[in-house]
């Protein structure tokens, strides 16, 4: 995990299931400035793959991703 990537905004998607974490991440990315980082917490098993795929397709960068038990923490930097 890249700890130097300080989040500008944090989303708590614990308890939400596909596609809700993805929808919230899209809105969260739109709400931050280019260069800032969005932090997302989720426990949906599909969230990691969905959020990584979203970031890649949208032209953003995943700067960190870790699992703590069944809880995902992912950091996405807005690039455009």
Residue ranges with predicted function:
Residues 73-80:
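Core SAM-dependent methyltransferase catalytic element
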Residues 11-66:
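Amphipathic, hydrophobic secondary-structure cores in small proteins
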Residues 1-2, 28:
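Short, flexible, glycine/charge-rich loop motifs used to bind or transfer phosphoryl groups or to couple energy/partner
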Residues 2-12:
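Right-handed parallel beta-helix/beta-solenoid
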